[in-house]
Design a protein with these regions (language model features):
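Conserved beta/loop motifs at nucleotide-recognition and modification sites
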Residues: 1-280
Length: 282
């Protein structure tokens, strides 16, 4: 079976037409965890969860133990569900061979799910490609990448509505610029902002006053204050960054980048380019 996308995975979960194996990987941690939980909640009957649900942390287990549980028959349910988080499957050729053998003849009554959170496999490596190929024989592989700014902003607008608050799409995009594009973090911020709005609108002022700024936003503020000559405010931001244990070289690099951009604009303007064309050269 070929790789499928997020929409196809949604359809499978909704229809209940499950495959015997799933591999979830990619950049977006929130989506991987979300769909792992969605599969579990749809497949596992809570009445018999103690018998039919087996969860493993890859740091603390062996593949043999995982596959033994995957061979078990379900009790009073259609499926035995085995969830494996962060198992370094591509590190061992022997593990890959064992997994290939299992997936080549996977039992129809088991759904085996591998997903990666803290562990970041090298998806371009020959070993991981073998893992993908093995999973495709018995099920589906889904690469969940970070969504576009527009998609995340729409999710935040809908999320605010579910929380009893209003959020304009442009304010949602501003929140992304302030707090970063990590969906799990953004939804945590949304919980806080919606509570503060108390059934009203989440405004730009509320975001400025309540949202936690990501590293990029804080460094942008630092650069802005340095360029404007506001040394006191710049030192306040710098102290906050040091309290966050940020590396000085990263901070220096980001601030230096602002001066490089200004120099590029100056050179472009000196070359007779208009303001809009000068910006293109940044």
């Amino acid at each position: 079976m070929p790789k499928i996308d997020e929409m196809q995975l949604k359809k499978e979960i909704k229809s209940g037409d499950f495959k015997n194996a799933y591999l979830l990987y990619g950049e977006e941690s929130y989506l991987k965890e979300y769909y792992a939980n969605e599969l579990k909640n749809k497949i596992v009957d809570k009445t018999f969860e103690a018998f039919n649900y087996h969860s493993f942390d890859g740091k603390d287990t062996e593949l043999d133990d995982i596959l033994k549980d995957a061979q078990m028959l379900p009790m009073m349910s259609e499926y035995n569900f085995v969830l494996v988080k962060d198992y370094p499957i591509e590190k061992s050729s022997n593990d890959i061979k064992l997994l290939e053998e299992y997936l080549s003849d996977a039992p129809d009554s088991t759904v085996l799910l591998f997903w990666f959170d803290a562990l970041d496999p090298d998806v371009k490596s020959a070993k991981f490609k073998k893992v993908i190929k093995a999973f495709e024989k018995a099920g589906n592989c889904v690469e969940l990448q970070k969504r576009s700014e527009n998609d995340v902003a729409k999710l935040l607008v809908n999320g605010a509505k579910k929380r009893g608050a209003l959020l304009d799409i442009n304010v949602a995009k501003y929140l992304i610029s302030v707090s970063g594009n990590d969906m799990k973090n953004l939804l945590n911020e949304l919980d806080k902002l919606a509570y503060y709005a108390n059934g009203g609108e989440i405004t730009k002022d509320i975001v400025d006053n309540m949202a936690t700024k990501c590293l990029q936003a804080r460094i942008y503020d630092l650069s802005k204050y340095v360029v404007a000559g506001k040394s006191s405010m710049a030192y306040d931001v710098l102290n906050t960054l040091f309290e966050m244990k940020e590396e000085p070289i990263i901070i220096l690099s980001a601030v230096s980048g602002v001066y490089v951009d200004m120099y590029r604009v100056k050179c472009a303007k000196n070359a007779g380019l208009g303001f809009d064309l000068a910006l293109i050269h940044i």
